Amino acid sequence: MAILSIDQGTSGTKALIVSAEGAVLAKGFAPVELTYLAGGGVECDAELLWQSVITAAAMAHGNWDGGKQGIEAVALANQGESVLAWDPDSMRALSPMIIWQDSRSASLCDARLEYADLVRMRTGLTLDPYFVAPKMAWLRENVTRAGVVTTSDAWMIARLAGAFVTDVATASRSLVFDIHRQCWDSELLDIWGLGAERLPTVVANAGIVGSIACADLKFLRDVPLAGLIVDQPAALFAQSCLVPGQTKCTYGTGAFLLANIGAAPRMSTHGLVTSIAWNMRGESAYYYDGQVFTAGSAVQWLVECGLLAGVHEIDALPRDARGIVASPGFAGYGAPRWQPRGTASIAGLSLASTRQELARAVVDGVAAQVAELIGAMGADAVPVQRLRVDGGLTQCRTLMQAQADLAQVPIDVYPHPDATAIGAAALARLALHPALRPADAIPVWRAQQTYEPEWSSDRAQEFLHRWRMVAKHTLNAPDG
């Protein structure tokens, strides 16, 4: 029996059919078009996003010769911090989907700085528009007060199976969820003016929440919906990061560094945030999280500016940017700087500089941001000895070697391009088979390739020093 695992991501929706052994039997994909607005807005048409879910699932099913083998369950991974308003009766979207990169609610965070310590101690998070509650409050103030306002997963689950729920990992990204008691926090909700909102019930990650009843997915009717989780901890699970200290980084639209820190929450003192990775069978795992908001989207900017023809050209870039240093914070900065109004900056250009060298500097800048996060992990007593990586950009040898050089750790490339969907499928299998151990639900994997550092530690530190000097000039840019 197979799992149909849906990964609803920033740039599109993937659907995989995954066998009991973890083999990917079929795939489907449908893109999602984002709109970038003045003032830091990033959104998409929510109904078109939903159609991408239907299209990807139908495509995967259509590409699969199941024979006698049926679909045992549907799993769902979501973006985590993307928000919309919707009608709980008709299921119709009442607003665009406000994407996790959106920073228009920065001023709402500024107005609540007096609560920063309280928020941090209860939620593990920093007051930043990246997280859910500021977007919810901004949407209520600026778009509509009708319907309910939730993260994207609650809406998709309601449309798939009729249940009004969210999973504990997603809830922990909200700024209004107590990660110690694992419940919504009424005081924090009031701080954001959300005390009267109807919120979804919070459920464990490896449980069954209902059966598919969506008219657009008749071929899945009555199949259990199980295995609900945020995309990043799903990838952490897929890469078998089950022991404290094990760390992964996913390189997609952004780059996200997560380290398992065990069964109890710990607060970072170096700018990282703490969230719930998963709760299953009454036991939880927590993680430290650091974010680079523009990784794949920085490469896409290079393409749109004509500096690259496509991602495939990255590995043809020169080995050195000849003094150009880039801090590609096109959507602001997450950990450890937390500067939503920060911008990108490039230094060291001359008349002799080439477009290839500029592109190389941007690629190195992405790796430098991740290296800075790895340093913060070490300062928080979670030293990264090896880094497991996944996502589309891991196929770029130039970026991965730069990452090994700047972070000064070996890089193990996960062999599948769809770690998030594989992780969600493993959680669904745990929901269906109570006797199955978590480690046995995860497909065994070996690194597709390992990158060892070629630079000396001194050379890496010298580069990171120059990069930090450039990054400092990008912070606190004026609104506009």
Regions found by a protein language model. Give the residues of each.
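Short beta-strand-loop/turn "lid" adjacent to the catalytic site in phosphate-handling enzymes
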Residues: 62-100, 122, 126-130, 137, ...
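Conserved small-residue
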Residues: 15-17, 22, 74, 102, ...
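N-terminal glycine/serine-rich phosphate-binding loop of ATP-dependent small-molecule kinases
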Residues: 1-95, 121, 145, 218-227, ...
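Short linear loop/turn motifs
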Residues: 199-208, 314-318
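Active-site core segments that coordinate phosphate-bearing ligands/cofactors
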Residues: 4-6, 110-166, 175-186, 190-191, ...
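Short, acidic/turn-prone active-site loops that include or flank metal/cofactor-
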Residues: 30, 35, 98-105, 171, ...
